[in-house]
Amino acid sequence: MVTMNRNKVVIVGTGQVGATAAFGIVTHGLCNELVLIDCSAAKALGEARDLDDGSEFQDRHVKVRAGDYADCKDADIVVITVGRKPPANSNRMAELGFTVGLVGEVVDNVMASGFDGVIVMVSNPVDVMAWYAWKRSGLPRTQVLGTGTALDTSRLKTIIGEETGLDPRNVGGFVMGEHGDSQFTAWSTVSLGGKPFARFLADNQDRFASVSTTEIEEKTRTRGNEIVAAKGGTNFGIASTVAGIVQTILWDERRIVPVSTLLDGEYGEHDVFLGVPTELRANGANEIVELDLSEDERTKLHHSAELVREHCEGLL
């Protein structure tokens, strides 16, 4: 039984993503206690002390410490970020062979502690790893989710903001499917200031004649690789995404976020994790919001599901 009191979060993996996610959780005061676990105990201890040293200047004190898997027993959320930096222009699925062994070991250790909270998977390929963690953990479907296309959706809104010069927070809509090459922008859901995006462009051709939805979608898809090529990895965007998901669950905000969650009949798919709009509550991925997608969008979603499902085969 999941019980949430904004008490305790554990992050497994203190590389760039894990450490930056920890920073976001601490600076926003999202929980009472944050525990860091890493294969290098010294690394986890160093990050914990570095984070804790800024406590005087935080709005709300979060106790940060290094720990071990026994700390997962009473944790509300365990965030899994283990993995390695991908090379530039690589496919996220290429990380599967390396990551699956790490994730399997982590999940086994987490569950051996008696954990009964929510697992938030960040490790890539995140849809495959979320499915694998769900199968391996034996937890209910609501209690295992991945970051999915939440970051991609944020990227879409940012890019639309760049193209139009408007605040990206005015943009509604979702990127759906795999967090990877087969992701797609569900343009039927995208709006700007409450107006369907296609209609917005048509009504403002004098200002936005050069704006192309095809180019926006491609920029969204390749944004991650561009960042990796420029700086060697991504950490701020995904860390903000993780912190947002953690806050939404811990604070029972009931926000709709396109996380990677198990499809069990929704959109005609079964036994696959994909990024789809999902109501997040204190119990995790509470309910999938099934949208009225266009025929083309449904075809793209099914294609994405097939790719993810193929990579899940043989993992157990």
Where do the model's predicted regions map?
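Rossmann-like NAD(P)(H) cofactor-binding subdomain of soluble oxidoreductases
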Residues: 92-157
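Conserved N-terminal Rossmann-fold NAD(P) cofactor-binding segment
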Residues: 33, 37-76, 309-316
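Conserved S-adenosyl-L-methionine
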Residues: 27-33, 138-140
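N-terminal Rossmann-fold NAD(P) dinucleotide-binding loop
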Residues: 18-19
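Beta1/beta-strand and adjacent pyrophosphate-binding region of the FAD-binding site
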Residues: 7-11
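Rossmann-like NAD(P)-binding element
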Residues: 56-118
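C-terminal substrate-binding/catalytic lobe of Rossmann-fold NAD(P)-dependent dehydrogenases
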Residues: 137-142, 153-316
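Glycine-rich Rossmann-fold phosphate-binding loop(s) that bind the pyrophosphate
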Residues: 14-15
